UniProtKB/Swiss-Prot annotation:
Function text: The pigment-dispersing hormone causes the migration of the distal retinal pigment into the proximal end of the pigment chromatophore cells and thus decreases the amount of light entering the retinulas. May also function as a neurotransmitter and/or neuromodulator.
Assigned protein family: Belongs to the arthropod PDH family.
Species of origin: Penaeus vannamei
A GO biological process held by the record: response to light stimulus
Protein name: Pigment-dispersing hormone type 2
Positions of post-translational Alanine amide modification: 77
Localization per Swiss-Prot or TrEMBL: Secreted
Signal peptide: 1-23
Origin: domain of life: Eukaryota
Assigned keywords, A-Z: Amidation, Cleavage on pair of basic residues, Hormone, Neurotransmitter, Secreted, Signal
Length: 80
């Protein structure tokens, strides 16, 4: 019962964040990454405890792209 409530709360949060995100239309790279990570977390919670056992798996290209994007994210954060 509590797990169902948590999943529904995450879905509501995701829906609200996507609604705000589509209103802005100019998401920055970091914001897109945060939304993608939130969606992945919601999917793992919805799939149950077996999804947490193996842990998240990233392909090499995803790891390289995320590492290459770090300086841009840090630079954007420094401008705020």
């Amino acid at each position: 019962m509590a797990r169902c409530f948590v999943v529904l709360a995450f879905l509501a949060l995701a829906a609200m964040s996507l609604q705000v995100a589509t209103a802005q239309d100019d998401l920055k790279y970091f914001e897109r990454e945060v939304v993608a990570e939130l969606a992945a977390q919601i999917l793992r919670v919805a799939q149950g405890p077996s999804a947490f056992v193996a842990g998240p798996h990233k392909r090499n290209s995803e790891l390289i792209n995320s590492l290459l994007g770090i300086p841009k994210v840090m630079n954007d954060a420094g401008r705020r």
